[in-house]
Regions:
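Substrate-binding cleft/loops of secretory-pathway carbohydrate-active enzymes
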Residues: 1-12
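Aromatic-rich peripheral "rim/lid" segments of glycoside hydrolase catalytic domains that contact
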Residues: 9, 26-43, 47-121
């Protein structure tokens, strides 16, 4: 569908809602491959990972952010909600007191490691 819309000049970017089901997570390689194959800017919207397993959630967030950076075509990432009192419990980067959780620090780490605080566009 993306190719048809792009060929017709109807789109020049794509937004992807990413409410990630930890049980159905595609590989990082397939995420990067998809983003690059569209050959247009990608905007990740509504990113969250609903799971009470803090380590798994942090790992998934980190992998998605790393894949987005690696793709070179992701222009923006929006997270769904602030604290875990969001639409699904334990799905965000902050706990129910709006304090950073492990996922927050893993995302921050990957951004710093990839030197993207100022360099990512």
């Amino acid at each position: 569908m993306v190719e048809v819309l792009k060929a017709e000049g109807l789109i020049d970017g794509i937004g992807i809602q990413m409410h990630v089901d930890p049980q159905l997570l595609p590989s990082v390689e397939s995420i990067v491959e998809n983003f690059r194959s569209w050959d247009i800017p990608v905007y990740i919207t509504e990113l969250d990972v609903p799971t009470s397993n803090a380590m798994l959630k942090a790992h998934i967030f980190s992998n998605i952010i790393g894949a987005a950076i690696e793709s070179g075509v992701v222009r923006q990432i929006n997270f769904w909600g602030l604290g875990s009192a969001s639409w699904q419990e334990d799905a965000t980067l902050f706990d129910s007191n709006n304090q950073p959780n492990l996922s927050y620090f893993e995302v921050l780490k990957i951004v710093i490691e990839r030197n993207c605080l100022a360099a990512c566009k």
